[in-house]
């Protein structure tokens, strides 16, 4: 699961809300091999998930999923896959975070947005996004 936090989700003047968490989930065949095969993917939106089984070949770059953050005018932004070239972002694993950071992500209230990868949400999000 790859997650992004946005302090504000406001695609049009006077609309939107504070705090937004979006995420993409990549389902692979075997996490123990150096280059696992991507089997499927799901991307979050306010209405749930867009699920791709299999992922379209143009949204895969080697072992990476290409994702874009787009506006769903007039109310929200969300994620979707893309064939467009992009940039790579640093990956920070849950276990790499300090105990204080994990505690904050487990306890801070983000209004109607919730941290998708914290202890209480990770498994339910995976289950809801399951594309098989």
Curated annotation (Swiss-Prot):
InterPro entries attached to this UniProt entry: NPP1 (IPR008701)
UniProt keywords, alphabetically: Secreted, Virulence
Full protein name: NLP effector protein 15
Classification via PANTHER family: DOMAIN PROTEIN, PUTATIVE (AFU_ORTHOLOGUE AFUA_5G00600)-RELATED
Subcellular location: Secreted
Entry comment, domain topic: Key residues/motif important for the effector activities are degenerated in most NLPs, including the nlp24 peptide consisting of the conserved region I (11-aa immunogenic part) and conserved region II (the heptapeptide GHRHDWE motif) that is important for phytotoxic activity.
Task of the protein: Secreted effector that contributes moderately to virulence during infection by P.capsici. Causes only small yellow areas at 3 days after inoculation of host C.annuum leaves; these areas expand somewhat and became necrotic at 7 days after inoculation. Leads only to chlorotic areas, without necrosis at 7 days after non-host N.benthamiana leaves infection.
């Amino acid at each position: 699961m790859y997650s992004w936090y946005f302090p504000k989700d406001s695609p049009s003047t006077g609309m939107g809300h504070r705090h937004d968490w979006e995420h993409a989930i990549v389902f692979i065949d075997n996490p123990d091999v150096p280059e696992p095969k991507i089997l499927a993917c799901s991307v979050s939106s306010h209405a749930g998930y867009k699920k791709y089984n299999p992922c379209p070949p143009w949204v895969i770059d080697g072992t990476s999923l290409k994702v874009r953050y787009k506006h769903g005018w007039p109310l929200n932004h969300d994620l979707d896959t893309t064939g467009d070239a992009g940039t790579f972002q640093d990956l920070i694993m849950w276990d790499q975070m300090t105990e204080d950071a994990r505690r904050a992500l487990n306890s801070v209230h983000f209004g109607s947005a919730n941290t998708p990868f914290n202890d209480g949400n990770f498994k339910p999000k995976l289950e809801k996004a399951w594309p098989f």
